[in-house]
Amino acid sequence: MSRAKRIMKEIQAVKDDPAAHITLEFVSESDIHHLKGTFLGPPGTPYEGGKFVVDIEVPMEYPFKPPKMQFDTKVYHPNISSVTGAICLDILKNAWSPVITLKSALISLQALLQSPEPNDPQDAEVAQHYLRDRESFNKTAALWTRLYASETSNGQKGNVEESDLYGIDHDLIDEFESQGFEKDKIVEVLRRLGVKSLDPNDNNTANRIIEELLK
């Protein structure tokens, strides 16, 4: 089966299964190798209520080589870059098989939202947040879903503060602001160090933060 026929067959299979709430469409009718896929966030996760858009580029060697997929929708997740939408998932790399379809790949991405792999991250900062404070991580991921993936979102953060966007404790920022440091610099350093909150007795981390703020 030619690549074009396979792609058309896969699109029809998605249309024939509306209960899956997955879509697969061409970006342009003149280019059958560039598509957009969508799926819903898994229930019971911080991504519930979101609709996630994935950009799909199908290579000439498909289905013997995997499609290139990345999220158009911003997602707060250990295995998805919070900046570019790049994805760390084995079936899109070395574990790809010709029997995998675009639909099943999207279902695998949906499953990835439900079951992150923080020890094999695409976004190290987010992975550290997930491992250190799951409750705070869930709150931040849910905020991103509301801001970027909900039906009422416009893809912009609006008036949401940068600290909230990355799950950083306000009291921690206030503490360093009281020492005369600028808020933007504090948030930048805390993000770079992967610090979301701080134990009052953790003097080593506090000193490291101050050293970075003074640079």
From Swiss-Prot:
Pathway terms, separated by semicolons: Protein modification; protein ubiquitination
Keyword field contains Membrane: no
UniProt keyword annotations, A-Z: ATP-binding, Isopeptide bond, Nucleotide-binding, Stress response, Transferase, Ubl conjugation, Ubl conjugation pathway
InterPro entries listed in its UniProt record: UBA-like_sf (IPR009060), UBA_C_fun (IPR015368), UBQ-conjugat_E2_core (IPR000608), UBQ-conjugating_AS (IPR023313), UBQ-conjugating_enzyme/RWD (IPR016135)
Pfam families linked: UBA_3, UQ_con
Disulfide bonds: none
Active site: 88 (glycyl thioester intermediate)
Upregulation: By heat shock and cadmium.
Miscellaneous comment: Present with 8940 molecules/cell in log phase SD medium.
Name recorded for this polypeptide: Ubiquitin-conjugating enzyme E2 1
